[in-house]
């Protein structure tokens, strides 16, 4: 019985570690078309510099749309056609932070933006 309880406790600890990963977005707002915004995503609970990072978005009443990805070291970046030339993804591994600079904003860019690992 004692052995079984130990395993349950170990599983609970491991699940707790997984739940400590946090990605907190900030910087959103309401702006007029043609203006700019910069989003930030503060990461914690994992080795940020070891992971490629993505931005995705969800427009009202629609599904998730991938926006951009940046490699773990910032060496490569890729964008959805809908934002290419207007949005720039970047990262600061010393600050564990991901960014999305959004220029020339359009009405169709209205969405909830999420960062993802």
Swiss-Prot record:
SUPFAM superfamilies: Immunoglobulin (SSF48726). GO terms for molecular function: antigen binding. Residues 45-52 are annotated as: Complementarity-determining-1. Residues 53-69 are annotated as: Framework-2. The modification Pyrrolidone carboxylic acid is found at residue 20. It is found in: Secreted; Cell membrane. Pfam families: V-set (PF07686). This is Immunoglobulin heavy variable 3-33. It comes from Homo sapiens (Human). The gene is IGHV3-33.
């Amino acid at each position: 019985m004692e052995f079984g309880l130990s395993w349950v406790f170990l599983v609970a600890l491991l699940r707790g570690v997984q739940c400590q990963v946090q990605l907190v977005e900030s910087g959103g707002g309401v702006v007029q078309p043609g203006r700019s915004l910069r989003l930030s995503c503060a990461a914690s609970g994992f080795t940020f510099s070891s992971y490629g990072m993505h931005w995705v978005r969800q427009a009202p009443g629609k599904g998730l749309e991938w926006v951009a990805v940046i490699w773990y070291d910032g060496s490569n970046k890729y964008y959805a056609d809908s934002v290419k030339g207007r949005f720039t993804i970047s990262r600061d591994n010393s600050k564990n932070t991901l960014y999305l600079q959004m220029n020339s904003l359009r009405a169709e860019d209205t969405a909830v933006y999420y960062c993802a690992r």
